[in-house]
Amino acid sequence: MSHFSKIKTALKDLDLLKQSLNDLAIKWYVKDNIVKGYKDQITFANIVIPQNNNYDIGFVWNGVEYQLVADLQFWQQPWSVEFFLNKLTQRYAYNSILKMANDTGFHPVNETVKENGLIKLTLQRWRP
């Protein structure tokens, strides 16, 4: 028997979530807002990520954060659930830092991605 699982995240900003999914080349939509599961089960999601097997995954707002919602038995992404969330969270943090930096007058001057995936970002404030 299969069912939807909801996994907590630290993702709170919908625009940053969308941008981070785009950065990872993950196709998503908000058109129908329905995640399809096993035996025609459905649940609401703010963002839907279609899968080739027709068992979608998505993100739903719980009032505090966006939770990943999926029927994990039918997970069909290039990464495991844990790795997917780690990559997405890293990208979300990166985009969040850039947004906050830009809002406070900073801009990136150097970025290095290490072999282990660690991103080193150097910011600078422009002072006229």
Curated annotation (Swiss-Prot):
InterPro entries in alphabetical order: Uncharacterised_Ycf35
Sorted UniProt keywords: Chloroplast, Plastid
Source organism, top-level taxon: Eukaryota
Statement: the UniProt record of this protein carries the keyword Plastid: yes
Subcellular location(s) of the protein: Plastid, Chloroplast
Pfam families: DUF1257
Gene Ontology cellular-component annotations: chloroplast
Similarity comment: family membership: Belongs to the ycf35 family.
Protein name: Uncharacterized protein ycf35
Species classification: Eukaryota, Cryptophyceae, Pyrenomonadales, Geminigeraceae, Guillardia
